[in-house]
Regions:
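Short beta-alpha connecting loops at secondary-structure transitions
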Residues: 209-211, 239, 267-275, 287-299, ...
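A mid-to-C-terminal "edge-of-domain" accessory segment
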Residues: 2-39, 293-473, 509-512
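N-terminal capping/small domains of soluble enzymes
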Residues: 1-107, 371, 376-379, 383, ...
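Alpha/beta enzyme core
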Residues: 4-7, 33, 44-68, 84-90, ...
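Positively charged, aromatic-enriched nucleic acid-contacting surfaces
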Residues: 459-463, 505-528
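Short, small-residue-enriched loops and turns at beta-alpha junctions
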Residues: 40, 44, 74-78, 132-134, ...
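Mixed-charge, glycine-accented linear interaction segment located at domain edges/termini
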Residues: 525-528, 532-553
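Catalytic alpha/beta core domains of metabolic enzymes, predominantly
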Residues: 216-351
């Protein structure tokens, strides 16, 4: 049985809050991004990546545009060590990319880390120790003073070994479990580390404040970051970094509000992979900025390709509703949504506006490698006439008359409902043609001839009706009127033509014409037919006969 009384809030609000960050509307520039896919992401996989897979993933991150990439914890295992050496010895690290390695604040681990870095042109050495109340009391059984000494001893050793090792080394410190640490104590630990390192304008250090486990609402984390930023020593020479996880589902919100509160840098992963519920998803963060007109400095212009590579290398699946990247994130099944999108697309084609503003689509799918035809309007039993007509128009060139769209919509939706499945564009085309186009039962057109008379047009129609040859004659003001009068003269049917429309089929055809006819019975019912033929006159006759044949059904 659930019992909320066993829980209490485990986070710490700052002793003072200015909330200056709440006055900012949006993030105006991209932070420094650091991918931790090859460490945090990899350690969370059921089957960690092999050496070759890691190398491929590293190249993938470089292609996306990451300039800082955490490549592992080289002292943790031979695999991690070998991967780092492979990158260095095979010169796989571009000059504009800085690798990052993780180490605990323990002497033998730090020494092993620097051994692994020999030959690296430039690297961030990321040292951490846990500072939270729970970790101090339950795991390490150490006092605040003892935990601070672990941090400062690690910082001193880092500085000494960096001086003794060839290469350009930058330092990063994380008070792990920061959000479960008393804020002023976390500040004291970070300032003590900074006093050891003495950062300068030409040699800045990184202080990383992780949401190791989410404990609060996002505004609390933002207030913590703002307090740390305002009270931290050497602030102008410190890169203030974030490392949010997603335990409460607020990883993106934590990050965005903390950036408003003064942070400069973000550590995260593609698609939010990571321990438990994952790290913050950098793709979502970057594209959220992009939709506000801010260049995220990362290239996500081919998300389908990136998704396939990620799923293959990690053996993980991207959730269908994952923001921006999921298979269904642009899909509209609802009839009203489809209608609004279709009208928005037509409006954009007509007006050519400078900025993107389409209902239900916060980003242009083309910008991230998606297609309107296959990704946006999706048809099932919940769809509407606008969406179905949009699919037929965009994929196959059918400009269905407005009054006919409702009938076609109900027909297609009924098929989807009976099959209990989504209909792809080719399924929709098949239904449309089978129900409306060139219907030849019971009447099948063989030939039609017209003669211009002073009194109008005379038509001679050669048909097969239920397999029996027939020859009908009729007069009218125009060709279609003459054919209609001939059909009614030789049958018991009574109707009037209420809609006629024609156009060239310019998608996937050889100069064919398409016509649509709606006929209304005396009781007010309207039945629709369509005809397709190389000759527009024949197409219009076929459309009329299709509609008349459907009256008999």
């Amino acid at each position: 049985m659930m019992n909320p009384s066993k829980y209490e809030r485990q986070y710490f609000m700052p002793p003072e809050t200015s909330l200056d960050w709440t006055k900012k509307e949006y993030i105006t520039k991209a932070p420094t991004w650091c991918s931790v896919d090859l460490r945090d992401g990899n350690q969370a996989l059921i089957i960690p990546m092999s050496l070759d897979e890691k190398v491929e993933f590293f190249k993938l991150l470089v292609k996306v545009g990451f300039k800082e990439i955490e490549v592992g914890f080289p002292a943790a295992s031979e695999t991690e060590y070998t991967f780092l050496r492979t990158l260095i010895e095979n010169d796989l690290i571009p000059d504009d990319v800085t690798i990052q390695v993780l180490t605990q604040a323990r002497e033998h681990i730090i020494k092993k880390t620097f051994e692994a870095l020999k030959g690296a042109k430039r690297a961030i050495v990321h040292v951490y120790n846990s500072t939270s109340v729970a970790q101090r009391e339950q795991v390490f059984k150490k006092s605040k003073e003892e935990v601070m000494k672990i941090a400062t001893d690690g910082a001193k050793l880092l500085k000494r070994l960096a001086d003794e090792t060839d290469g350009n080394f930058l330092f990063e410190y994380s008070p792990e479990s920061f959000t479960g640490t008393e804020i002023d104590y976390a500040l004291d630990v970070c300032n003590a580390v900074l006093d050891v390192w003495q950062p300068r304008p030409d040699w800045k250090v990184i202080i990383n404040l992780p949401v190791t486990v989410q404990l609060s609402l996002p505004h609390v984390y933002a207030s913590q970051i703002e307090y740390m930023s305002k009270h931290m020593k050497y602030r102008e020479n410190v890169v203030l970094s974030l490392h949010p996880h997603n335990d409460r589902g607020c990883g993106v919100a934590d990050t965005e509000l903390a950036l408003l509160a003064g942070a400069d840098r973000v550590e995260g992963t593609l698609f939010g992979n990571g321990e438990r519920t994952g790290n913050v998803d950098i793709i979502t963060l970057a594209l959220n900025m992009y939709t506000h007109g801010v260049d995220p400095k990362l290239d996500f212009s081919n998300l389908p390709e990136l998704t396939k590579a990620y799923e293959r290398l990690t053996r993980m699946s991207v959730y269908e509703r994952q923001p921006y990247t999921g298979q269904l994130v642009f899909a509209a099944f609802s009839g009203s949504h489809q209608d609004a999108i279709a009208k928005g697309m037509h409006w954009r084609d007509e007006k050519h506006p400078e900025h993107w503003n389409i209902p239900y689509l916060p980003i242009d799918p083309h910008d991230v490698g998606r297609e309107y035809e296959s990704d946006v309007i999706r048809i099932n039993s919940q769809s509407g006439k606008g969406g179905i007509s949009y699919v037929l128009e965009e994929n196959f060139g059918f400009h269905i008359p407005g009054k006919m769209r409702e009938d076609v919509g109900y027909t297609v939706k009924d098929v989807s409902d009976k099959r209990h499945q989504e209909l792809v564009p080719r399924d929709i085309l098949k239904v449309f043609k089978e129900v409306y186009v060139n219907i030849d039962d019971p009447c099948k057109l063989k030939e039609v001839h017209f003669v211009q008379k002073d009194s109008g047009i005379e038509a001679e129609i050669s048909l097969e009706k239920s397999g029996v040859p027939k020859l009908y004659h009729g007069k009218g003001n125009g060709r279609l009127d003459a054919v209609s009068n001939a059909l009614q003269r030789h049958s018991d049917m009574h109707y009037s033509i209420v809609t006629y429309q024609e156009h060239a089929l310019n998608v996937g055809s050889n100069s064919q014409a398409c016509a649509y006819v709606g006929v209304q019975e005396p009781n007010g019912n309207v039945t629709w037919g369509s005809g397709i033929h190389e000759d527009i006159i024949t197409a219009s006759v076929l459309a009329l006969i299709s509609a008349v044949n459907r009256l008999d059904q």
